[in-house]
Amino acid sequence: MAKRVAIVGAGVSGLASIKCCLEEGLEPTCFERSDDLGGLWRFTEHVEEGRASLYKSVVSNSCKEMSCYSDFPFPEDYPNYVPNSQFLEYLKMYANHFDLLKHIQFKTKVCSVTKCSDSAVSGQWEVVTMHEEKQESAIFDAVMVCTGFLTNPYLPLDSFPGINAFKGQYFHSRQYKHPDIFKDKRVLVIGMGNSGTDIAVEASHLAEKVFLSTTGGGWVISRIFDSGYPWDMVFMTRFQNMLRNSLPTPIVTWLMERKINNWLNHANYGLIPEDRTQLKEFVLNDELPGRIITGKVFIRPSIKEVKENSVIFNNTSKEEPIDIIVFATGYTFAFPFLDESVVKVEDGQASLYKYIFPAHLQKPTLAIIGLIKPLGSMIPTGETQARWAVRVLKGVNKLPPPSVMIEEINARKENKPSWFGLCYCKALQSDYITYIDELLTYINAKPNLFSMLLTDPHLALTVFFGPCSPYQFRLTGPGKWEGARNAIMTQWDRTFKVIKARVVQESPSPFESFLKVFSFLALLVAIFLIFL
């Protein structure tokens, strides 16, 4: 009899978890509290309790070739950076293609997930749900929690003296939907993450004046990178990742700063991070420099005091009149349906082995999928987590002893990747390629470059020097996809097909042949160094 698995949430990670369960012969039941799938990517005019919320203009920060499921590319005619409405359509295509909808119970809230009395032996869970005011209970062999971390807004009002006396309007960025509310207003956006910069830029087209307040600064980059290529297809390669992890941190930091400042000198724009010894998570915004240099957005430091109709920033005694304050101050995460003894959250951190498994459970039958913030796309990350987690739930893969897992968790908390700086979600950050490769190793699905070099050198060069696209994760092992090689070799074709409507014939450069030979030799050297 197939093991029954309860999946909480039908967003990007929930859909991947359903599919992974089916591939391993398990019986998934997904509970989704809203009336449709998509999670974060489904725009609604009103904020829904317990579900991530996005504004109308949201576009993906990772391009389509890097943010798809590993065996299901985006349609060729989709733009490289996908608007939320088309992203939702893609998720629906995925669900229909793999026949996932019949495993989802919509409008069903998970009220509680508790251990059964014999859980020490069976590992089973009792899941209590609510559908149309009717409560039901069922026993499951395992549970996969796929609710993400963008549902509980962090609103640190105590850190803003005088905020209670403010007579204007203030709200968290989670409440923001359209820029119309900013028309002819003086707006202050607090927080310089992706949402904060997006909202400041949008407001600047309608507002009288816009201030963007940041305490620590940030590295702002464009989606359009070298020669107009998508940023992550250039930045996210195995070759570059090897260099970043091999070279001394000061050298990596210097090289990265130099590269980032080629587009925008952050010091001149008042954006440079306060702590430059570490590289913070990138902020993706194509318009911000233009809005700053044309006097539409004003960068300011942290706030000293909030008055009835104004604020005072820390570098001045001048009062700036303000009508609306937007707190783009991030999120905390919690699992209200889980007992604290199952997953305890302290100081924004959950003690999870590989960001997935509670280390103290006697039976590894509960997995948290998608509670991570990689420097890369969430879809392939969550999907890879689900592929490994399902095999652990099934009993095919084993976890280390609890003591070993706890030791690693503690070490991770103390030693975050050195090229990330502090931010609200520091505890969730990870090195994208290194992390995914680690999970792929557990299921014997990590690409073997040495073997590939002998059997398919063209593919090996592309995998090592080209974009680390999700298709690489399906070249071998369980869940191998026969279309993976072709998807890798044609990824640049799909990237340019939608934008290169005007084609000019180009003469082949003799230098290209030299570059190919050089790349091949560089690959040999790199592989030799890896196996030293």
Curated annotation (Swiss-Prot):
Broad spectrum monooxygenase that catalyzes the oxygenation of a wide variety of nitrogen- and sulfur-containing compounds including xenobiotics. Catalyzes the S-oxygenation of hypotaurine to produce taurine, an organic osmolyte involved in cell volume regulation as well as a variety of cytoprotective and developmental processes. Gene3D superfamilies: FAD/NAD(P)-binding domain (3.50.50.60). FAD binds at G9, A10, G11, V12, S13, E32, L40, W41, N61, S62. NADP(+) binds at S60, N61, S195, G196, T197, D198. It is found in: Endoplasmic reticulum membrane. Its main location: endoplasmic reticulum. The keyword Thylakoid does not apply. InterPro entries: FAD/NAD-bd_sf, Flavin_mOase, Flavin_mOase-like, Flavin_mOase_1, FMO-like. It is an enzyme of class 1 (oxidoreductase). The modification N-acetylalanine is found at A2. This is Flavin-containing monooxygenase 1. Its EC number is 1.14.13.148, 1.14.13.8. The chain crosses the membrane at residues 511-531. It is a single-pass membrane protein. Residues 2-510 are lumenal. It catalyses: hypotaurine + NADPH + O2 + H(+) = taurine + NADP(+) + H2O; hypotaurine + NADH + O2 + H(+) = taurine + NAD(+) + H2O; trimethylamine + NADPH + O2 = trimethylamine N-oxide + NADP(+) + H2O; N,N-dimethylaniline + NADPH + O2 + H(+) = N,N-dimethylaniline N-oxide + NADP(+) + H2O. GO terms for biological process: energy homeostasis; negative regulation of fatty acid oxidation; organic acid metabolic process; response to lipopolysaccharide; sulfur amino acid catabolic process; taurine biosynthetic process; toxin metabolic process; xenobiotic metabolic process. Belongs to the FMO family. It comes from Homo sapiens (Human). Its cofactor is FAD. Pfam families: FMO-like. Coiled coil: none annotated.
